[in-house]
């Protein structure tokens, strides 16, 4: 019986057959660098050796970050060493995020909120808002302001000839005294325009009673609806009070509208 001939293989094939897989991953630390060596198969099903080099550096991190790095891994990574695993984690460049408050950015970029560009100024409290929106409107501060303006306008009407400014003829007559042959002084009447439809006689009286005494008030109303037409006439007993009313109320904000006050034109007989 002939003997069986044995065919000897190469030593590399024998080592591979004895091992039966890829060599384990190794890590070495030298001169502040960590070298990670691992083996894997490429696209051609050949063994390849991959060496990764990491530079070891120390940095100060928050306590929460340091504590999170000591957490015990779980699942298929429960036996992994601390730190990222190259097979399950891909380390990319660090991205620093900065969170901004969108409302603060809108306020910073809003030109209307710039104090140097704010053109609104309250005549009651000198705040940076319109007089219509003043929180002190109708309070003692507003009342004192109207009284001061009335006194200033009255004194200006008396002292006007001394200053060299133009004075209407009816103001000159008022300084001389008397109303002449006319039974009613129509030259002390003013016309208030741009009133709201909800304006009433009580509101009109409340608007002008602090300036001076009146002899007559007329609020124009629509015959069909009974609503205010938007204008009214007020006759003061003294011309200086009428002049003060024009000075105070012209351009004054009332009921979300800007009033327009002027001298009433006399009717032709």
Curated annotation (Swiss-Prot):
Q: Name one Pfam family in it.
A: RRM_1
Q: Where, subcellularly, is it found? A: Cytoplasm
Write down the InterPro entries for this protein, in alphabetical order.
Answer: eIF3_g (IPR017334), eIF3g_N (IPR024675), eIF3G_RRM (IPR034240), Nucleotide-bd_a/b_plait_sf (IPR012677), RBD_domain_sf (IPR035979), RRM_dom (IPR000504)
CDD domains referenced in this protein's UniProt entry, alphabetically:
eIF3G (cd12933), RRM_eIF3G_like (cd12408)
Does the keyword Protein biosynthesis belong to this entry? yes
A cellular component annotation (GO) from this entry: eukaryotic 48S preinitiation complex
Question: What are the protein's UniProt keywords?
Answer: Cytoplasm, Initiation factor, Protein biosynthesis, RNA-binding
Q: Which domain of life is it from?
A: Eukaryota
Q: Which part of the chain is the RRM domain?
A: 188-266
| A GO term, aspect molecular function | RNA binding
GO BP of this protein = formation of cytoplasmic translation initiation complex
Q: What does this protein do?
A: RNA-binding component of the eukaryotic translation initiation factor 3 (eIF-3) complex, which is involved in protein synthesis of a specialized repertoire of mRNAs and, together with other initiation factors, stimulates binding of mRNA and methionyl-tRNAi to the 40S ribosome. The eIF-3 complex specifically targets and initiates translation of a subset of mRNAs involved in cell proliferation. This subunit can bind 18S rRNA.
Q: Name the family.
A: Belongs to the eIF-3 subunit G family.
Quaternary state and partners of this protein?
A: Component of the eukaryotic translation initiation factor 3 (eIF-3) complex. The eIF-3 complex interacts with pix.
Q: What's the protein name?
A: Eukaryotic translation initiation factor 3 subunit G-1
